[in-house]
């Protein structure tokens, strides 16, 4: 893992904190594989760092394949585990391209095992995705806040299963946020909406796309989502 930073590209500041081991390691793997796909060379140093990132994921993995946020923070977050699944798949591609077939297969198998557990976060009795599975085996109750509860619905729709009930709930309770501190920006809504159909969703999607076209270069976004 590594520490989080605050600020802008002109002035970053180390917070001396790390948010989560599992998603931090997954992010490195996603970036490394994206770098390779963009034409970058997979050097021995990158391969070694990818192995370290996988070791970090393993350190916080439970016997069911899901990951805890940190060794001393035993919560399995839906969003973190979606990111870990993507990171493991990225690692598989990275190791395949660099000629390490056995490690690629191991990463792929772990990703598929984890992916098979993600549907558990859908709670049919609530008609919602739970944002977290706790150490006592219970799923966390709804927080009623855009983050993490609202965003977890969008993650679940986009990356687990396109549940219409979750979409109806999130659009009824929340609106997209904007600004550099927003955790619930329109790009996440677009990713969820792209999994759904229907005239209402199409109208909503067209409106958000139109709003996005007005953004300035300085507007903060998760640009990969767009």
Report residues per predicted region.
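The core hydrophobic/aromatic register in alpha-helical repeat solenoids, strongest
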Residues: 32, 88-91, 95, 193
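Extended ligand-binding clefts on enzyme/binding-domain cores
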Residues: 16-23, 41-48, 59-69, 73-86, ...
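Enriched - but not universal
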Residues: 5, 125, 170, 191-192, ...
């Amino acid at each position: 893992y590594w520490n989080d930073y605050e600020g802008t590209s002109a002035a970053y500041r180390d917070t001396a904190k790390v948010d989560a081991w599992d998603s931090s390691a997954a992010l490195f793997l996603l970036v490394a594989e994206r770098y390779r796909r963009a034409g970058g060379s997979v050097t021995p140093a990158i391969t070694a760092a990818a192995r370290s990132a996988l070791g970090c994921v393993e350190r916080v993995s439970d016997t069911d394949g899901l990951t805890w946020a940190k060794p001393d923070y035993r919560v399995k977050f839906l969003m973190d585990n979606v990111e870990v699944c993507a990171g493991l798949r990225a690692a598989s591609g990275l190791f395949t391209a660099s000629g390490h077939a056995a490690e690629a297969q191991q990463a792929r198998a772990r990703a598929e095992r984890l992916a098979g557990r993600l549907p558990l976060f859908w709670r049919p009795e609530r008609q919602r995705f739970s944002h977290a599975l706790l150490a006592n085996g219970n799923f966390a109750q709804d927080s009623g806040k855009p983050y993490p509860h609202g965003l977890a619905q969008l993650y679940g729709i986009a990356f687990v299963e396109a549940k219409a009930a979750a979409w109806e709930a999130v659009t009824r309770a929340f609106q997209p946020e904007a600004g550099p501190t927003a955790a619930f920006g329109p790009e996440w809504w677009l990713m969820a909406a792209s999994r759904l159909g229907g005239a209402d969703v199409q109208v909503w999607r067209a409106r958000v796309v139109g709003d996005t076209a007005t953004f300035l270069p300085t507007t903060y976004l998760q640009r990969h989502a767009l």
